[in-house]
């Protein structure tokens, strides 16, 4: 565990897929910022050949990633690692069983390759956390909780 810094430009509380992705995007777009990512649970040691052991947010559940999210991961240089573990969404069926109305969307009819991708959270976690370790402007503090924050005027 890294000691919690006393000051940072940005503090991200929560190291799930959204928090880690935000940290990666900030490191890429605004590398001059000092970012602190705080996660209550300990992150496991990474072995890219193995799925993560249970970690909140990076477990055996699956997540549907929108086309824009897939594009963001490509911009971060991560999609090449993620793609072999992804399944494209070609069709969406929307209904409220027992009630009037439904909608069916087909990627082909919308002239898009897919609406997004479905991926197991565990592999997404492996790739995101490995990328995070390569970001010198992000300090990761795992296994800690935040009880208070103070904002400072510049």
Residue ranges of each PLM-predicted region?
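Glycine-rich Rossmann-fold phosphate-binding loop(s) that bind the pyrophosphate
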Residues: 15-17, 40, 121
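Beta1/beta-strand and adjacent pyrophosphate-binding region of the FAD-binding site
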Residues: 2-18, 36
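Conserved N-terminal helical subregion
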Residues: 85-154
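Glycine-rich FAD pyrophosphate-binding loop
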Residues: 13, 25-61
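Acidic-histidine catalytic/liganding microenvironments
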Residues: 30, 76, 135-136
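N-terminal FAD cofactor-binding segment of flavoenzymes
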Residues: 53-97
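Short alpha-helical segment within the catalytic ATP-binding CA
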Residues: 21
């Amino acid at each position: 565990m890294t000691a919690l810094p006393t000051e940072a430009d940005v503090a991200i509380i929560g190291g799930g897929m959204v928090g880690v992705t935000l940290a990666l995007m900030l490191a890429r777009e605004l590398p001059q910022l000092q970012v602190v990512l705080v996660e209550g649970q300990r992150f496991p040691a990474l072995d890219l050949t193995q799925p993560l052991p249970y970690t909140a947010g990076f477990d055996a559940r699956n997540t549907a990633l929108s086309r824009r999210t897939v594009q963001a991961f490509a911009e971060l240089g991560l999609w090449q690692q993620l793609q072999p573990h992804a399944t494209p969404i070609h069709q969406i069926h929307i209904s409220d069983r027992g009630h009037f109305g439904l909608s069916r969307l087909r990627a082909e009819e919308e002239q898009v390759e897919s609406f997004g991708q479905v991926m197991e959270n565990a592999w997404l976690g492996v790739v995101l956390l490995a990328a995070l370790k390569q970001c010198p402007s992000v300090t990761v503090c795992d296994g800690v909780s935040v009880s208070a924050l103070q904002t400072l005027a510049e």
